[in-house]
């Protein structure tokens, strides 16, 4: 919905504040436009309407979440799901919010339901994968990232986290390396970088894999990372570490 359509809906709502359908359409438009304050101002009165539709609660869950008002966001998403249990978007948003609050079990339950309702929705698979990754359920996380990639081939974040899952599987408890898993991690990181040139986190983690493998490729990757982040102040500490790792690797390769 473009600005012209939003302006038209605002005029309709101003002319007839009792037109609930127009107010709902405007609320959707403001949420899509990421105009959170305006959406909040419109949505609060709609919540007070008797038998407010599930879509109002779902939209306000998104708005409150974007504003960092986590408890209110969770409450709104739960109300939306109470009214419409099969709302995949509300389930996805609730799962994301619960993951943010470290309620992993409930988050996984919501995300798995969302996936069941919308199996082609890449972002849901990806978010499910990130929660599983934090739970160290690496193989399940990899499957979730694979499904995200199947639904949306250009998804550098999914390849990046797929690489992370393989990299963590590649480090055995006794300190030994599983080179098959590390090779899978390398390929995933490379694809992420190919899809997003200069992807700092993927370059850094790729460098770390080569560092552990004592591969000369690590020297080249560390140089790439330093070059890609030279104008990024937030990467300064990591850039210094990368330079240290590079020198250490060069010493080991001599």
Give the positions of each predicted feature:
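Terminal, low-structured helical/coil segments at or just beyond the last alpha-helical repeat
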Residues: 1-7, 212, 219-254
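Structural signature of tandem alpha-helical TPR/SEL1-like repeats
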Residues: 1-10, 33-45, 67-79, 101-113, ...
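Structural marker of alpha-solenoid helical repeat scaffolds
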Residues: 15, 49, 83, 117, ...
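Helix-start (N-cap) detector for alpha-helical repeat units in TPR-like alpha-solenoids
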Residues: 20-21, 53-55, 88-89, 122-123, ...
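A generic tandem-repeat structural signature
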Residues: 50-123
């Amino acid at each position: 919905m473009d600005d012209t359509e939003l302006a038209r809906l605002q005029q309709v709502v101003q002319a007839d504040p009792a037109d609930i359908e127009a107010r709902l359409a405007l609320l959707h438009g403001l949420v899509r436009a990421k105009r959170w304050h305006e959406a909040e101002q419109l949505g609060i009165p709609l919540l007070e309407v008797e038998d407010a539709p599930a879509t109002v609660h779902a939209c306000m869950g998104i708005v409150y979440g974007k504003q960092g008002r986590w408890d209110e966001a969770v409450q709104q998403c739960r109300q939306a799901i109470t009214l419409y249990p099969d709302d995949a978007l509300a389930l996805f948003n609730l799962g994301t919010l619960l993951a943010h609050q470290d309620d992993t079990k409930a988050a996984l339950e919501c995300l798995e339901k969302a996936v069941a309702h919308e199996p082609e929705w890449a972002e849901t698979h990806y978010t499910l994968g990130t929660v599983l990754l934090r739970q160290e359920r690496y193989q399940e996380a990899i499957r979730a990232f694979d499904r995200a990639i199947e639904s949306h081939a250009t998804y550098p974040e999914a390849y990046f986290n797929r690489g992370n899952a393989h990299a963590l599987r590649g480090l055995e408890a006794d300190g030994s390396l599983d080179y098959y898993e590390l090779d899978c991690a390398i390929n995933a990181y490379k694809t992420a970088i190919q899809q997003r040139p200069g992807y700092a986190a993927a370059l850094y983690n790729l460098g770390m894999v080569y560092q552990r493998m004592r591969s000369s490729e690590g020297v080249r990757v560390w140089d790439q990372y330093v070059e890609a982040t030279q104008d990024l102040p937030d990467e300064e500490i990591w850039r210094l570490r990368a330079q240290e790792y590079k020198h250490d690797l060069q010493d080991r390769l001599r």
